């Protein structure tokens, strides 16, 4: 397993269709890429103003950062590998793993459907988010006037 894969490779990884014989009980064992350990989803406040979206533009301008909205709200999706992931996709600190890892459930995870496909909105670049902002705010280009 290549823990230094780029974001494009990671997107292809999560877009893969799972085998049909996968159940909740055997899903983690069939996930050879440790998909859940290759990204972080950080919930963010719902962006409402031009200033909020301008800040998101700055964030999504960085490598391996996406912004998405789903039924649970808005999130930053950060592609980054867990430093404890060993070759073969197993956790190197399993007995001492953080609580968030212990609470994680595989009832429905990226092995079933990629976050990108399950999202209502998905922005992987400045260009895509700015296009959305121009539609959402009629005076989007005038947002810089607040800084004058």
Model region roles, listed by residue range:
Residues 1-148:
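Short loop/turn segments that flank or connect secondary-structure elements
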């Amino acid at each position: 397993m290549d823990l230094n894969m780029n974001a494009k490779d990671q997107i292809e990884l999560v877009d893969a269709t799972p085998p049909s014989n996968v159940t909740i009980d055997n899903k983690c064992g069939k996930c050879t890429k440790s998909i859940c350990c290759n990204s972080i989803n950080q919930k963010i406040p719902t962006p409402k103003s031009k200033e909020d979206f301008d800040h998101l533009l700055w964030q999504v301008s960085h490598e391996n950062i996406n912004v998405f909205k789903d039924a649970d709200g808005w999130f930053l999706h950060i592609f980054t590998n867990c430093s404890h992931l060993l070759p073969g996709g197993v956790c190197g600190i399993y007995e001492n793993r953080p609580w968030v890892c212990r609470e994680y459930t595989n009832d429905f995870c990226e092995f079933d459907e990629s976050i990108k496909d399950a999202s209502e909105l998905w922005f992987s670049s400045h260009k895509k988010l700015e296009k959305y902002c121009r539609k959402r705010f009629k005076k989007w280009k005038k947002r810089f006037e607040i800084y004058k």
